[in-house]
Amino acid sequence: MKKEETPADKLLKKAESKIGCSYEYGATGPDKFDCSGFVQWCHDQIGVTVPRTSGEQYDQGASATGAKGDLVFFKKNNKINHVGICDGDGNMINAQCSGVKKVAISSVKPNWGMGDNCGYKTFL
């Protein structure tokens, strides 16, 4: 019997389909994204409404643990400045604003100057 696809599975599929798309500040898809626009677009594709900015997403999301489909947030200078979608294996799919400047898979551990990991939230 085939296992039914969970909302987290569906979200990850949408996120994976955009790997390689360009980063652009303020962009919300479907071919260019900033980090929070990417998160919002992916959720929208599975029928889940998510706020536009990473700060709003952090404030309005429910507490989570970093499981598949959860959002991971980063803070720099006391301000939420980055968000990605957890794959459940210690990585995230995110629209990177520096480095490759594309939607890519990277570690949930802080790197490329994104700030400190400050927690996980979910809208699923």
What are these regions (language model features)?
Residues 1-2, 51:
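Short, intrinsically disordered low-complexity segments
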Residues 25-26, 74, 95:
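Thr-Gly-centered strand-to-loop micro-motif
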Residues 17-68, 115-118:
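Catalytic cysteine-centered active-site loop
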Residues 8, 12, 36-39:
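A general structural signal for well-ordered alpha-helical packing
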Residues 2-9, 29-33:
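Soluble non-cytosolic domains of exported or imported proteins
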Residues 6, 13, 52-64, 80-124:
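Aromatic- and glycine-rich peptidoglycan recognition patches
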